[in-house]
Structure formats: C-alpha cells, structure tokens
C-alpha cells in the first residue's frame, strides 16, 4: 500500500466517522453488537493484535490508524466515540478524563502487576481510568550486528533519520530532544519539564536542543532530506537501518517491526554515549506505552479490556506479535535482543521515564513537533524563539483550564 493510499484511506475514515459509519471487521455476525476499538496498530501489527482479540470470542470491530488522536477527536465530536480507545498520548486521555468521558477500569486489571511509571496519575483526576497494554523501550540506538559503534557521539552522516509518518510528523525528532534532556539533566528535571513545571526557555533545555541542532547544522542538506524521509523507510523495504546508507538509528524497540524478516540482523546499544554533546552516563531510560481507556459502558467492552490485560493474553501477544508487556507478572521474553530490552524494563538501578511528548497536552505536543520540524529545516537558526513559542502555547493551555490544570504524576520511577 502506498503512502498516498494510506492518506486517502485516513480521509475516508474521517468522513465515515462523521457520518456515523462503522468499519467492517471480524469478530461476529453483522447482527451482533460489536465492541468498537480504535488503536494505533496497522498492517502486520494490526493482524497480530486481531489474532489475540479473536481468541476472546467477543464480537468486535477494530480501526487501526497512525492518526489515533485525530480520528478519536472526530468521533468524540460526532457523538460516536469508540468503546475502547488505545493511545500512546496519555496527555490526551487526561483531557478526556477531565471532561468526564472515561469510565473506570477498576477491577479489570491487577494494579500491583504494573510498577512505575506504567500507571501515571493526574492531579484532580480519579484513578483507574487508563491502563498500559503494550510497552516499548527508547533511549537506545540500533545498529547492524557485527558493526557495533564506537561509544562516542557520531556525525550526522552515520544516523538513519526520517520525520515522515501517516499521522502527526515530528515525533522521531522529539525523541532525540527528550533523550538529550533525560541524559543531560536526569529524571527529576525531565519529569518537571515533561509536566510543564520547568519552562521550555530554561537554559538547560535550550542547551540540550542546541546540541541536536548543532549536529544537524553540520550538514543542512542531509538534514533537509531526513526531514522528508519516512521514518519506516521505503514501502516494502527493511527500514532505514537495513536499507543502507546509514549505520545508526535512534529508535524505540518497535523499530524491529520496520526491519521485517531481517530484524534478526539488528542489535542495540544505550543511546547516552552516542548522543550529540556526549558521551553521557545513562541516567534513565525513556519508555513509551499504548494506554487503553474505556469510553463505552457495555459489559462486553469491559470484559474485552479485562481479557487483554490478563497475564495469559499479554504473554500470547508478546509471543505472536513480538511486543513487550508492562505487566511485571509476564515472564521475560527469550532471545538475546528481547532479553536486553526486558532487562532494562526491570533493572531497579536505572529509572524509567515515560515519553515526554506523550505526557504533554495535545496542543503543547503539536507545538513541540512543529519546533522540531522547523529546527530540521533551518538548523543554524537560534532555537530560543522556537522554544518561546512552545512556552507561550503551554501558558495558554494552562489558562484555558481555568486555573485547574491536571499535571501527570509518576512520570518517572524505578521499576518494581
């Protein structure tokens, strides 16, 4: 499927949503009421997720899109939200919770099986409104096996970078900024910045951003090509790393899905020593999760979440789909690379911190992404004006909350 075709299907999906139409999917006859699910997984990952769902015997329809935020917003505004929404952006779920749209997940999963930071709270919001279904490790750099990098900052020519996506663009660059702030400033200041307590114009934030911009500015033409490249590599290929032309990829554990049947050729190293301005000491690992929230009130939807959250389903999904579970009761996966990912998820010596842009309110995140793209397009320009613009958006966001913001808590923590 071409990128243009995907974009067309996305637009069609929005029109169908606005008209109240459903998307056909397996899981029961047309006469049966189906649990409607919106999630971020498409292509092979969608098939693997459906394979797990099909084992529950609960009729469902699944809509997979990289633009979960836009589709969910359209469905909510049309008065027809899905029963279950699965989003990486926990900040958006906080906004829906503040509007009273989310139903409690109490008794549908065992909270003690999920350590920090997998169960973040929000000030002024009741607990048990979201739960993590899938986890990914960030703060890592992929390389081809047998070609381990020297543990020092690498030039731009070594890096595999692409900003393009079917949904919001810019997040591959925001991951660089987040990782730099985390490794330079540590988890405490990182959490303050991610939740809006440390300003974007703080000198330490500017210095981290400058380190990334400085690397890009050494070869602005290459940076411009990276701005236009798709982060997954060419359609039908094996990702950016295994497609040739670069040696290192700053990408999460989900990157192996891009490498396809050649994923066994890739290994990873902690990113801290390779980041611009380093080498740094590993101070924490950035992680991400896809969180499920319940918009519907039906018993079937509640039962489906309960089944998805169970140890058996999480273990089966990991086995069939190669994904990682945030559930501490799920045994570590086998395989050298899988073991290294699992070890970092459970190493109590090194804190884990949720992806900062996922924690931020949607408007702030959008401004963050825009500033990333502008930096790639014009890397030699000063970064302070761009960060001032983000800070202004953040101030306006807080003002729109009538003095009652709901910042997330527990963004960083040591695993159990």
Regions found by a protein language model. Name each.
Residues 69-81, 99, 153-155, 231-249, ...:
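Short helices/loops that flank or line small-molecule/ion binding pockets
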Residues 286-362:
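Mature extracytoplasmic/periplasmic domains
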Residues 346-416:
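Conserved C-terminal helix/tail region of periplasmic/extracytoplasmic solute-binding proteins
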């Amino acid at each position: 499927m071409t990128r243009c075709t995907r974009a067309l299907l996305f637009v069609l999906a929005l029109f169908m949503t606005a008209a109240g139409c459903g998307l056909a999917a397996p899981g029961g006859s047309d006469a049966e009421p189906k649990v409607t699910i919106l999630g971020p997984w498409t292509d092979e990952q969608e098939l693997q997720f459906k394979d797990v769902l099909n084992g529950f015997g609960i009729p469902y329809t699944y809509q997979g899109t990289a633009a979960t935020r836009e589709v969910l917003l359209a469905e909510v505004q049309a008065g027809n939200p899905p029963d279950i929404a699965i989003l990486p952006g926990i900040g958006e779920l906080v906004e829906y919770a503040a509007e009273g749209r989310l139903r409690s997940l109490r008794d549908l999963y065992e909270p003690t099986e999920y350590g920090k930071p997998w169960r973040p709270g929000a000030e002024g919001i009741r607990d048990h409104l979201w739960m993590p279904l899938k986890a990914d490790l960030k703060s890592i750099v992929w390389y081809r096996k047998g070609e381990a990098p020297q543990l020092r900052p690498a030039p731009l020519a070594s890096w595999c970078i692409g900003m393009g996506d079917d949904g919001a663009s810019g997040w591959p660059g925001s991951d660089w900024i987040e990782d730099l702030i985390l490794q330079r400033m540590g988890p405490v200041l990182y959490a303050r910045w991610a939740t809006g307590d440390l300003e974007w114009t703080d000198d330490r934030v500017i210095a981290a951003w400058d380190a990334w911009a400085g690397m890009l500015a050494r070869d602005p033409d290459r940076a411009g090509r990276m701005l236009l490249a798709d982060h997954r590599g060419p359609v039908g290929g094996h990702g950016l790393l295994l497609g040739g032309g670069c040696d290192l990829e700053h990408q999460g554990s989900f990157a192996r899905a891009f490498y396809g049947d050649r994923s066994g050729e890739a290994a990873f190293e902690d990113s801290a020593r390779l980041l611009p301005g380093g080498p740094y000491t590993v101070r924490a690992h950035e992680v991400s999760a896809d969180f499920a929230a319940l918009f519907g009130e039906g018993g079937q939807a509640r039962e489906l979440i309960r089944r998805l959250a169970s140890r058996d389903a999480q273990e089966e999904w990991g086995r069939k789909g190669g994904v990682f579970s945030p559930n501490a009761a799920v045994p570590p996966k086998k395989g050298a690379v899988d073991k290294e990912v699992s070890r970092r998820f459970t190493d109590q010596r090194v804190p884990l911190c949720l992806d900062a842009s996922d924690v931020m309110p949607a408007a702030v995140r959008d401004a963050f992404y825009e500033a990333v793209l502008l930096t790639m397009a014009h890397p030699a320009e000063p970064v302070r004006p761009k960060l001032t613009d983000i800070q202004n958006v953040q101030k306006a966001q807080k003002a729109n909350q009538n003095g009652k913001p709901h910042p997330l808590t527990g963004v960083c923590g040591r695993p159990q």
